[in-house]
Amino acid sequence: MILLIDNYDSFTYNLVQRLGEIDPNMDIQVVRNDELTLDEIAERSPERIIISPGPCTPTEAGISVECVKRFAGKLPLLGVCLGHQSIGQALGGKIVRARNLMHGKTDMIHHSGGRLLNGLENPFQATRYHSLVIQPDTLPAELEAVAWSEEPHGGR
């Protein structure tokens, strides 16, 4: 089962839909970031956790940061936008305002390949929608940047 933590963002269901297209039999449980405790997450025994985008900062994202602290290294974690920032903050990265706000703007995204990005062109065009980033020089050693934009300084 995949547990998807919803940070009160409609894009959460875009993720659910896409995952269902990949595997229609995939068991996906969506919970709001303030509906479960960490112990209740553990009781559900997810195989993976996805943390969704949202309209706030990681500090304001319910259990998102604490979930990463508890399950990092034990379960595969994927963060999208705010979820990505929550993973970065939980592991010691500093979340800062992006030099340029990217609300609905397209950019070319480069990547290092690998399982997650397999089959995507390199680079590929993506729509970006964020105003916060992990400050690049604070990227925790446990994390590896596998995709980045062409925008320097704050594009990761």
Feature roles, as predicted:
Residues H84:
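Catalytic nucleophile loop
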